[in-house]
Design a protein with these regions (language model features):
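Polybasic/polar functional segments that serve as interface/processing modules
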Residues: 1-129
Length: 129
């Protein structure tokens, strides 16, 4: 198959919005021609320690709950709320819309792929680690 266009955004935790410090914790990728919407999200102990260094009073459970909500929206899980029930492209655009909350997406970027899942994994490795 020929390469198809995709869009992606990096998910960032911004523990104190007023300070602008951020930690990359995931990537959301959409490839419309392949009907693909996927996310890789990871907030392990090392990243939690980094967040606590930025904001000692951070509510880690709240962050984890919000990240789980994003996973559910991507999967179209009915427990993900009304946004999870939208069509794939609409869910992607809701997830990557600018916000001033603790979890923020980067600006949306584009690329070409023959394998959206492999591109998601590659971007995650490069941008989140």
């Amino acid at each position: 198959m020929p390469p198809e266009p995709f869009e992606y955004a990096v998910l960032r935790v911004v523990p104190r919005v007023e300070r602008g410090e951020q930690l990359n914790v995931g990537v959301v990728l959409q490839c419309r021609p392949r009907r693909f919407l996927g996310a890789r999200i990871e907030l392990g102990e090392a990243k939690l320690d980094a967040l606590r260094a930025m904001a000692p009073d951070i509510d880690a459970d709240a962050v984890l709950t919000h990240l789980e909500g994003i996973r559910r929206i991507v999967a179209g899980d009915p427990d993900g709320g009304p946004i999870a029930k939208l069509a794939r492209p609409e869910r992607f655009h809701w997830l990557v819309s600018p916000s001033s909350t603790m979890i923020q997406p980067s600006p949306s970027h584009t690329g070409l792929t023959e394998d959206p899942q492999a591109s998601l994994d590659d971007l995650f490795a490069k941008l989140v680690g």
